[in-house]
Amino acid sequence: FEDQDEYRLGINYAQKYLSILEEKRKMQKDRCIAEMFDVKEIESAAGLPLPYVISVTARNDNDYMWRNYADNYNGVVLELDLSYLRGGYDYAILCKLEQCIYEDTYSDDELVDKIFQAYSDGGYAFLNTNKELFMGMLKDYPQLFVRFIAMYILAFFAPRIKRNKFKGEEESRIILS
């Protein structure tokens, strides 16, 4: 992920809203993952995979994007049919198309809902790929299972967060992990 400042912002958002979610839902201690979202620990974790992000906008007349990302208007337009890219698992690569979340655009309650959706999506993604393995892990080693969910959130929620000054981009991201 090229923009480390944005990624750190996303990690901090994940930690904040996971903490609120865990408290609000009175989650069991072994299901809580907010404390895992420490920027320094994540940055120093050897071998931790970073997501690949392709930034797109639905607006073909977005002057800001052309000026800043296409070498001062010198670029190409790539048209993609993203209707199938709602999220899925294929050949050990997870991919999702997600709208960016700009700072101060959503209320805390809305962000808690979004992080809960990411938490749920993570659990579903793993259970959907190898149900027997992950059900056994959830039963016998719940903390290990939620670590996988934490990695999912790190891959698919954190890269969505952007600073308000970029709101004009109206950006969505294809995230590969």
Predicted ranges, named:
Residues 1-177:
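Partner-binding and oligomerization surfaces adjacent to conserved cores of proteins
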